[in-house]
């Protein structure tokens, strides 16, 4: 016989595919095996046994009905006539007599073959082969989607990920956290779920899509001691699983090839079932035990009419009825499958019950082939979907990232990154991490925390452990904060720096930091809430003293006006956007420092002259060409620092002499050609920067500046320095590089406090040895060509090189 196992290749699939075989597919597989056995058994009998046995019919005209009946019975049954009674004279001898046909074995074989081909109905001949073929087609249809490249690749990928998610220690840990919930909460959740199920009746809603999930037990009995332990390797594996699930979901949700293929193969099986039932029911009666055969072979055998016996007719008849029963059950199962496919919304899958039972509220619903495979999984075991859902949750992913972060960033490793920032605070910078490690809050000596390009940061209540924390920097970070952490920051935070690209990166909780003293904002702001980020009122920042905004505003935001009464320093860096409305400046009566940088200003704003408390004004990188309004600065008695650098100012008006309180003046990177002697009537100037202009002459009145400590005319066109410059005995820094100087006066030795001298880029041929009298000047503070330095006496050179 042919073993059934030879046909397993038609239905063979990977053992892991069983999770995508619902009960009806398993049931039809068993039915297919039964039908396959019928076909194989019938084919084996057909091959190994005689198909038909025929005897010739002899027509005798003069016989009564009795004798004809005897002859017919003899021919049909191929049994000899009863022997004649033995002669009494010879009782020991018995002679067997019957109807002689005068046919040999070859002729009988020929007759059997001819009658099998001509007289026997085709259904009786090919019944076992038809059963075998139909069954193999059923098997191919049932398993085609497991073999087709376009679908099998998705299925294999899905099952691979599913198995890893099911066995992942992170899944056990995530679900074990749910099992520890308060029993009252779980009872309330269950009651709410039952009520929602009662209300939702009639057509299936979104919850009914995953109705099989209701059979999942609400609690998992997990040993928390084992569930809580997750080493670094397991954490990395779980992290990789999250990425795989994300990519797989994006790939599979794009199409519905799996659903379409499963529907088509089911429809094909139903059509085939109807065809089989139709023609088998009509032809099963053609399987007869006795067959009359009329073939024209009289010239070869001497007979034309034959009576044949289909030896397997009785068995085939029973097998055909049995086969029809199996096919009927198979077909009804396929009809139920079609009902399930079209009645249920299988292109959408809701995790509503999983969200309710696990408390993980952000598990998304899925669609298309992803949803269909999950529906199929639920028919196998709903627990697979529940454990798989853990890897669809961003909350779960964030918890895992947090755990991995804590394992990677230990307190000792974080302490190695500590540094002192510009505010002389001990700062910890963290850049481009997946989150904020909990171990940060174990570094109690931390004074400043700087976070850059970190998404979904959650500041926990444990930040209260950082007793010394005063400064927080958030650069392109979306931050959420625990209520207890917010209370801590309200009391302790002094400095907040925020760099943002969109509204999500501008923390809404910053408006309530009542003890905040310094606020630095960098990002695009707009007065139109529909276009960009808007700044809300800062009125609750009662302690705010310094406000810096680097943005593109066209006027001073109203939020700034809300803190004008106590604001002491305001900086606006406008990135070239023209600042046109400055009337709100008049309300900032306590302002001591004002920076309007890169605001495309063409004139000094008149509102500035109302700031009687102003001490420092910076108008860097504007479009100032004339500063005639500088005369109004005489009313600003406290103004000590004026920065007009990086503009297009061509001359300095004589009115500058009225700024008698001026101590620091920045005029670099302009187009000044002539220095007015009246400038040096501001005799309190300690810092004077005139570098990068077109100045050719330094007035001798510079000697009046007896408080001058810093003087720079780098990159001008000065050809000589007045001797009066060396009367400025307090001068510490002198920058005269990149000019047209040819001689350095020996009087430079009068500058006893000189510690920095830049003379590089001139036409000097020799340096005066009097430089040795500048005891504070060392080689590191002398910027000069090496060849020119060698012109100094050796003792002077050694003196400068000495520490």
Curated annotation (Swiss-Prot):
Molecular functions (GO terms): volume-sensitive anion channel activity
The keyword Nucleus is assigned to this record: no
Biological process according to GO: aspartate transmembrane transport; cellular response to osmotic stress; cyclic-GMP-AMP transmembrane import across plasma membrane; fat cell differentiation; intracellular signal transduction; monoatomic anion transmembrane transport; protein hexamerization; taurine transmembrane transport
Compartment annotation: Cell membrane; Endoplasmic reticulum membrane
Keyword Transmembrane: yes
Transmembrane intervals: 23-43, 126-146, 267-287, 321-341
Membrane topology classification: Multi-pass membrane protein
Extracellular side, ranges: 44-125, 288-320
Keywords: Cell membrane, Disulfide bond, Endoplasmic reticulum, Glycoprotein, Ion channel, Ion transport, Leucine-rich repeat, Membrane, Phosphoprotein, Repeat, Transmembrane, Transmembrane helix, Transport
Subunit structure: Heterohexamer; oligomerizes with other LRRC8 proteins (LRRC8A, LRRC8B, LRRC8D and/or LRRC8E) to form a heterohexamer. Homoheptamer; inactive, likely because it is not targeted to the plasma membrane in the absence of LRRC8A. In vivo, the subunit composition may depend primarily on expression levels, and heterooligomeric channels containing various proportions of the different LRRC8 proteins may coexist.
Role, per record: Non-essential component of the volume-regulated anion channel (VRAC, also named VSOAC channel), an anion channel required to maintain a constant cell volume in response to extracellular or intracellular osmotic changes. The VRAC channel conducts iodide better than chloride and can also conduct organic osmolytes like taurine. Plays a redundant role in the efflux of amino acids, such as aspartate and glutamate, in response to osmotic stress.
Protein name: Volume-regulated anion channel subunit LRRC8C
Gene label: Lrrc8c
């Amino acid at each position: 016989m042919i073993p059934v196992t030879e046909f397993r290749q038609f239905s063979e699939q990977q053992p892991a595919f069983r999770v995508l075989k619902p009960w009806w597919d398993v049931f039809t597989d068993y039915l297919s095996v039964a039908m396959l056995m019928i076909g194989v058994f019938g084919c084996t009998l057909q091959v190994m046994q005689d198909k038909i046995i025929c005897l010739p019919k002899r027509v005798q005209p003069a016989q009564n009905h009795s004798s004809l009946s005897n002859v017919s019975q003899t021919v049909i049954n191929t049994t000899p006539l009863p022997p004649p009674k033995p002669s009494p004279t010879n009782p020991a001898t018995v002679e067997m007599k019957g109807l002689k046909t005068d046919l040999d074995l070859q002729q009988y074989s020929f007759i059997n073959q001819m009658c099998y081909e001509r007289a026997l109905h085709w259904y009786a001949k090919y019944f076992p082969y038809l059963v075998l073929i139909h069954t193999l087609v059923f098997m191919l249809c049932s398993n085609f989607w497991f073999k087709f490249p376009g679908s099998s690749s998705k299925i294999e990928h899905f099952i691979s990920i599913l198995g890893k998610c099911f066995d992942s220690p992170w899944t056990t840990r995530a679900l074990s956290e749910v099992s520890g919930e308060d029993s009252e909460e779980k009872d309330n959740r269950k009651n709410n779920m039952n009520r929602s199920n009662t209300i939702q009746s009639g057509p299936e809603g979104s919850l009914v899509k995953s109705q099989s999930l209701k059979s999942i037990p609400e609690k998992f009995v997990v040993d928390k001691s084992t569930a809580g332990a997750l080493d670094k390797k397991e954490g990395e594996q779980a992290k990789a699983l999250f990425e795989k699930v994300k990519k797989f979901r994006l790939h599979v949700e794009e199409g519905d090839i799996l659903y379409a293929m499963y529907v088509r193969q089911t429809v094909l099986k139903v059509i085939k079932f109807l065809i089989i039932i139709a023609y088998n029911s009509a032809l099963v009666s053609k399987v007869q035990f006795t067959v009359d055969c009329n073939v024209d072979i009289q010239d070869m055998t001497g007979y034309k009419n034959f009576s044949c016996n289909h030896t397997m007719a009785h068995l085939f008849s029973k097998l055909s009825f049995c086969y029809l029963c199996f096919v009927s059950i198979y077909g009804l199962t396929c009809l139920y499958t079609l009902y399930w496919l079209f009645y249920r919304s299988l292109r959408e899958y809701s995790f509503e019950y999983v969200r309710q039972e696990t408390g993980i509220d952000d598990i998304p619903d899925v669609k298309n082939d992803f949803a269909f495979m999950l529906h199929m999984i639920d028919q196998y075991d709903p627990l697979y979907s529940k454990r798989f859902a853990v890897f669809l949750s961003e909350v779960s992913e964030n918890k895992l990232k947090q755990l991995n972060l804590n394992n990677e960033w230990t307190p000792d490793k974080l302490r190695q990154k500590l540094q002192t920032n510009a505010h002389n605070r001990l700062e910890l910078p963290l850049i481009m991490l997946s989150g904020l490690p909990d171990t940060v809050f174990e570094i109690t000596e931390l004074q400043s925390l700087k976070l850059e390009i970190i998404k979904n940061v959650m500041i926990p209540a444990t930040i209260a452990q950082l007793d010394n924390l005063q400064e927080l920097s958030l650069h392109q970070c979306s931050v959420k904060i625990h209520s207890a952490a917010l209370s801590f920051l309200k009391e302790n935070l002094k400095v907040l720096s925020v760099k943002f690209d969109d509204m999500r990166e501008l923390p809404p909780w910053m408006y309530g930091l009542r003890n905040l003293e310094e606020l630095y904002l960098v990002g695009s702001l707009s007065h139109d809430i529909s276009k960009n980020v808007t700044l809300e009122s800062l009125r609750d920042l009662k302690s705010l003293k310094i406000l810096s905004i680097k943005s593109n505003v066209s006027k001073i935001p109203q939020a700034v006006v809300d803190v004008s009464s106590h604001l002491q320093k305001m900086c606006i860096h406008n990135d070239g956007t023209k600042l046109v409305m400055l009337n709100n400046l008049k309300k900032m009566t306590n302002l001591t420092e004002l920076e309007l940088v890169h605001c495309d200003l063409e004139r000094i704003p008149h509102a500035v002259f109302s700031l009687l408390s102003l001490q420092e004004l910076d108008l860097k990188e504007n479009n100032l060409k004339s500063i005639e309004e500088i005369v109004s600065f005489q009313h600003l008695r406290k103004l000590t620092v004026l920065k007009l650098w990086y503009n297009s100012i061509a001359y300095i008006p004589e009115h500058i002499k009225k700024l008698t309180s001026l101590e620091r003046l920045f005029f670099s990177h302009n187009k000044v050609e002539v220095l007015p002697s009246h400038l040096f009537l501001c005799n309190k100037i300690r810092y004077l920067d005139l570098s990068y202009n077109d100045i050719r002459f330094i007035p001798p009145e510079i000697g009046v500046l007896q408080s001058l400590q810093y003087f720079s005319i780098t990159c001008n066109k000065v050809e000589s320095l007045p001797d009066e410059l060396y009367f400025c005995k307090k001068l510490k820094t002198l920058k005269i590089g990149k000019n047209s100087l040819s001689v350095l006066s020996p009087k430079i030795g009068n500058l006893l406090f000189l510690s920095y001298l830049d003379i590089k880029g001139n036409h000097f041929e020799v340096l005066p040895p009097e430089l040795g009298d500048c005891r504070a000047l060392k080689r590191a503070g002398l910027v000069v060509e090496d060849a020119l330095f060698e012109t100094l006496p050796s003792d002077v050179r050694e003196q400068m090189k000495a520490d």
